[in-house]
Amino acid sequence: MKLTLISSCVALAFMALATEAAPSGKKLSIPLTKNTNYKPSAKNAIQKALAKYHRFRTTSSSNSTSTEGTGSVPVTDYYNDIEYYGKVTVGTPGVTLKLDFDTGSSDLWFASTLCTNCGSSQTKYNPNQSSTYAKDGRTWSISYGDGSSASGILGTDTVTLGGLKITKQTIELAKREATSFQSGPSYGLLGLGFDTITTVRGVKTPVDNLISQGLISKPIFGVYLGKESNGGGGEYIFGGYDSSKYSGSLTTIPVDNSNGWYGITIKGTTIGSSKVSSSFSAILDTGTTLLILPNNVASAVARSYGASDNGDGTYTIDCDTSSFKPLVFSIGSSTFEVPADSLVFEQDGSTCYAGFGYGDYDFAIFGDVFLKNNYVVFNQEVPEVQIAPIA
């Protein structure tokens, strides 16, 4: 699931961005990191996503029971759009950690010096070296459907996101993690979902605390995930959004957060002049790589593109997409596309694997294949999202 980090760093100079929020916001530039030896795997991406949603809710814990501003955190495109991560500072003095920003979960956990089997290449948080760390006393454990897991203890410390300093944030210190987590480019996960699905009940997420501590002017965050073909990278803006990153106007869509996710309704799907599906539910998930559709929808889409079912959730598709029409979803009062150049995710010699797949769920998971083509503003308070095509 996670990838071996054999990387070269390419520093990018980021242009100053015009953000829609208070002018006191801070911005952080992050280099683009690529693993030139990595081979994208559609099969692994499908398995990772399905394992993630299978585990809800197979979690356990020992006790389950104003300055306005914006902060922006650029994110790194980890080789061919396989994973985006941002840098977060934890503790005093701070240690900088690469974390997977994930709207499909709500936990903030990362490798620590208490971990007996964490990857040797991972930067580890040391609670004994932070003057602002405090013990919590509770434990946490996450088990995924594919058998991978992470577990450890809870504490509180100062967490800084894009220049915004959250005090007394509950953090989950990993004491053990499965081998699938040990070699990836990120050292943990920062969940941006709703607090109803935190592993330990009652824990407030970083977004909760950004709002309650008055660190952001609006209860929103804008997400831009850049394509590797356009230089990669991307950015999260907490408390605002970047109007230069999208074209046209934002379409507002209500969110169903009853399961702790950013759930929306897809009214229909078209390819060219052909309607290929009626309505279905979907989750907007920055922590999932592919576009995972309900089985019947995926089958109809695959037929339209002449793709072949591999029996493992993936499809083989023609490597030449020049004649393909975009995959178009009707959402709210607008339509949003996955263009032809995003329909191929992985190429193995003369064989190509599609950027869409399927699972055993009756809902879709709109991962990075959709999100890197459409700018999204997440509003936790209403709740709602606003979407527009990328510029």
From Swiss-Prot:
Enzyme Commission designation: 3.4.23.21
Keywords of this entry: Aspartyl protease, Disulfide bond, Hydrolase, Protease, Signal, Zymogen
InterPro entries: Aspartic_peptidase_A1 (IPR001461), Aspartic_peptidase_AS (IPR001969), Aspergillopepsin-like_cat_dom (IPR034163), PEPTIDASE_A1 (IPR033121), Peptidase_aspartic_dom_sf (IPR021109)
MF terms in GO: aspartic-type endopeptidase activity
Catalytic machinery residues: D102, D285
Reactions catalysed according to its record: Hydrolysis of proteins with broad specificity similar to that of pepsin A, preferring hydrophobic residues at P1 and P1'. Clots milk and activates trypsinogen. Does not cleave 4-Gln-|-His-5, but does cleave 10-His-|-Leu-11 and 12-Val-|-Glu-13 in B chain of insulin
Residues excised as propeptide: 22-68
Enzyme class: hydrolase
Domain Peptidase A1 residue range list: 84-388
Highest taxon of source: Eukaryota
Disulfide bonds: C115-C118, C319-C352
GO biological process annotation, one example: proteolysis
Signal sequence range: 1-21
Family note: Belongs to the peptidase A1 family.
Protein name (Swiss-Prot/TrEMBL): Rhizopuspepsin-2
